[in-house]
Regions:
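Catalytic phosphate/metal-binding cores of nucleic-acid and nucleotide-processing enzymes, i.e., regions
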Residues: 1-140
Length: 140
């Protein structure tokens, strides 16, 4: 057979498993954030709730244009303006997701300036955080 290449089944399985884990992580983070935003937009004590499109995959040209317009890597995922005048800022991660160095810098700057920001790993966690900020129970 000369030039034939045979791949080990375990090798192929591990590649597929890694790709599946990446996909599931993205889906899970998307679902957590989507569910939270749906909840937030139904609450009377939340005036405004919006997402920042930092996770959006764009062509290199589009990404360059977005950066020139002010897109800043590391900005948290969702901002909620509450009726008490405070912001509740949420970075969503899965159970295994990690905060990037850029995200840590931005989160630290927000905390240094007395902004309520949290990394939440579930919709429930984000809901509790926002309620704590609104009720004055979240102390920076």
């Amino acid at each position: 057979m000369g030039n034939a290449v045979y791949l080990d089944r375990d090798f192929l399985y591990n590649i597929r498993k890694k790709e599946l884990e990446k996909t599931m992580t993205l889906i899970d983070e998307f679902t957590i954030q989507k569910t939270f935003v749906e909840w937030a937009r139904k609450q009377d004590f939340i005036i405004l709730c919006f997402a920042v499109p930092n996770g959006f995959k764009a062509s290199s040209r589009a990404a360059l244009m977005m950066k020139r317009e002010g897109l800043l890597p590391g900005v948290p995922d969702v901002f909620c303006l509450l009726k008490n005048g405070k912001w509740a800022i949420v970075e969503f991660k899965t159970e295994i997701g990690k905060v990037s160095p850029q995200q840590k810098v931005i989160i630290d700057k927000l905390l240094d300036h007395k902004q309520a920001v949290a990394v939440c790993r579930s919709t429930r966690e984000a809901v509790l955080f926002v309620k704590q900020v609104y009720n004055g129970e979240f102390v920076i």
